Amino acid sequence: MDWRPWMDAFLPPLLEALPGRVAFVGIQGSFGRGEAGPESDVDLVVVLDALGAAELAVCRGVLEKMPFADRACGFFCDRAALAAWPAFDALQLRLDTLPVYGSLEELLPPM
């Protein structure tokens, strides 16, 4: 599976379901590194302006409609949580995440 068409199908419904609330979407793991096999997970990074149970339910609803939904996993957080990360975690996220929508640079603490 090529992750790009999958992401092209995922991103518009996510942006529509959470208008103005999505700060960043990226891909990690084997797809992000170009090492994915036929059974690889789709490792997402999604950062919202604020994240609670309602927002997680919306994200889950969008993901459940996707092909290979059972392979979607990853990290969902909000701006405030990400801004408070220690530098070593922020560096790892920067190095291991391929941006698809938005930029991590404005969301992470300065290096």
Each model region followed by its residue ranges:
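Generic marker of residues within folded, mature protein domains
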Residues: 15-17, 34, 83
